[in-house]
Amino acid sequence: PGPALPPALPAELREALQRRPARRPRIYVTFGTVFNRSPALFVAAQAAARLGGTVVVTTGPDGDLPGLAQLGAHVHVHRFVDQGALLPYCDAVVSHGGAGAMLGAATHGLPHLVLPQAADHFRNARALSRVSAGSSVDLERQSVEAVSTELSKLLTDGAMSVGATLLAREMAAMHDA
């Protein structure tokens, strides 16, 4: 019998992440398991794919949106991926601003682009912006062009990387206290 749990990351995904093309970002796109059928997930995936790096999109159990698999060989679509195993490879996260993605990105010191959909997502996006650990695109502006532009800024703005790193350190210090 094999192991009870699958490997942390599928082998082909791990290899793609390790073969990082020069100066190309590795971006994780997730909308969790509640907002995984939102059109914004497809917009976010398209926007990330435009930047040409390695993109990992998780859809959850019922979030298969038509067309995600056709975004290019550099876009890897999975129902679930072990976020803790994936995030150390990433340069940024794009999400709806749910608790899981927020905590994962913050813990790993990753700049985070939030496309808020409902509930606490808007407040979470504002909190990230206040500490320069991320930014957001409002509901009415969530086009591929707007999201791609904002994601490009997020990846090139050194202040966002610094803010995300400081947030991770602050969270680690709280854990150690």
Label each residue range with its predicted role:
Residues 28-30, 38, 89, 93:
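C-terminal, well-structured subdomains that either form a transmembrane helix-short loop-helix hairpin
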Residues 29, 55-57, 114:
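Structural beta-sheet core signal
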Residues 9, 39-41, 124:
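Residues at alpha-helix caps and immediate loop-helix transition turns in enzyme cores, especially N-
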Residues 1, 18-21, 44-45, 65-177:
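Nucleotide-activated sugar donor-binding and catalytic core shared by glycosyltransferases
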Residues 39-54, 60:
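Short hydrophobic signal-anchor/transmembrane segments that target glycosyltransferases
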